[in-house]
UniProtKB/Swiss-Prot annotation:
This is 3-phosphoshikimate 1-carboxyvinyltransferase. It comes from the Bacteria. GO terms for molecular function: 3-phosphoshikimate 1-carboxyvinyltransferase activity. Its EC number is 2.5.1.19.
């Protein structure tokens, strides 16, 4: 699907969807608890539905509560699957479920979608090998011969993806002796490990971590059933926060300003650039002001790259976005996708190994390739609405995390049409 955006000045009120990261973590924790758990206000999108489907095919009963926005999970009823477990394009599903399947006493075949195949799994595979697990990749399939895990020490790099570490944390309580996880390098995206710890705590799991988070210890212990409420998604909000800074005031509800989510820092970056930020209990409002360039380290909030780059393109002066190397191994090579998109819109941009240098200016409409990446589509959807005459390819990719994105943009006054 291709989206065409005419020039407009979108602004107004929206509520962002629930957090993908918390929904997936909550689902996997609930699936390992004895008894019934409730996930309240889950995100319903491709990535979370992938996790739900994989768990269902492993014998976990998950139903939607009638008349309420919640899922009911009857946990710890795992059984051998009858076929492949399709993870769609969800890296969190593939990585987290690889670890969970490793401790189940049967063979599992986890099938990756097309773009997911290019995202690295080796550090997690090597970590599971250390624990005695037989796991290998065959084309787009990860084959795991699960077993009772009696080894308790594992080491892996922390600077490639926090998801490898979160995967081990989610499986650790069910290991015979728990797990002691050593990170050989400081962790990237540290807030995501804190989110995992918070979720585990909601299901009764005690986690011990060193100050620098390079040592994590989780004793063997049972998951307890819980009522687990999912907060709003700061990552999904980031493009609309940028919109408020470059176009017209945007009021966003369903955002916890005290959240552990890494991408909450977006409002700090926008404030440093000159935008006016207001916030209260469960809401944020961004008012446009003349923006200046920024030096921003995205090491722990890499998903902000597209949205912050769009704001930087409209700012006066130079912006340097650093700590972005790992953006190359997301749903697309986001450094290349952002660079190509902004260049097409007339913005001078220098692409380096771990930095993007953006000279702010006056972007103009262009043909934008989203590369099937939801965050690229959303960020350029915002910018395209402001400058007009913009076409975005593969725009349906937003269903990965934000199915109503284009509808929400229209509700704010964006002129969005689907090209036939």
């Amino acid at each position: 699907m291709k989206i065409h955006l005419d020039k407009s000045l979108p602004g107004g009120n929206i509520a962002v969807p629930s957090s993908k990261s918390y929904t997936i973590r909550g689902l996997i924790a609930a699936a390992q608890a004895n008894g019934q758990s409730h996930i309240i206000s889950p995100l319903i999108a491709d990535d979370t539905l992938a996790t739900r489907q994989v768990l269902s095919e492993l014998g976990i009963d998950i139903s939607t509560d009638a008349g309420s926005e919640s899922w009911e999970i009857t946990g710890n009823t795992f059984k051998a699957p009858s076929g492949n477990l399709f993870c769609r394009e969800s890296a969190a599903t593939l990585r987290f479920m690889s670890a969970v399947c490793a401790r189940l006493p049967f063979e599992c075949h986890l099938l990756a979608g097309h773009s997911l195949m290019r995202r690295p799994m080796l550090p997690l595979i090597q970590a599971l090998h250390q624990l005695g697990i037989e796991i290998e990749t065959r084309g787009n399939t990860t084959v795991i011969n699960g077993q009772v895990i009696t080894r308790s020490k594992v080491s892996l790099p922390g600077n490639i993806s926090s998801q490898y570490v979160s995967a081990l944390m989610l499986m650790a309580p069910a290991c015979t002796h728990g797990l002691e996880i050593h990170l050989a390098t400081p962790p990237a995206s540290l807030p995501y490990l804190k989110m995992t710890k918070q979720t585990l705590g909601s299901f009764g799991i005690k986690v011990h971590s060193s100050i620098d988070w390079q040592e994590i210890s989780i004793p063997p212990q049972p998951y307890l059933p819980a009522r687990y409420r999912v907060e709003g998604d700061w990552s999904s909000a980031s493009s609309f926060l940028a919109l408020g800074a470059i176009a017209a005031p945007v009021f966003i509800s369903n955002l916890d300003t005290d959240s552990f989510q890494a991408d909450r820092i977006m409002i700090k970056f926008l404030a440093e650039m000159g935008a006016e930020i207001e916030s209260g209990q469960n809401w944020v409002k961004v008012n446009p002001k003349p923006l200046s360039g920024i030096n921003a380290d995205l090491t722990h909030s890499i998903d902000l790259l597209p949205a912050l780059a769009v704001a930087a393109a409209c700012a006066k002066g130079q912006s340097i976005l650093s700590g972005v190397r790992q953006a190359r191994i997301k749903e697309s090579n986001r450094i290349r996708a952002v660079s190509q998109g902004l260049s097409a819109m007339g913005i001078n941009i220098i692409e380096e190994d771990d930095r993007l240098i953006i000279e702010g200016g006056q972007p103009k409409g262009a043909e934008i390739d989203s590369f099937g990446d939801h965050r690229i589509a959303m960020a350029f959807g915002i910018l395209g609405s402001v400058v007009g005459e913009t076409h975005i390819s593969d725009a349906e990719c937003v269903t990965k995390t934000y199915p109503d994105f284009w509808k929400n943009l229209e509700s704010l006054g964006g002129k969005v049409t689907q090209d036939v």
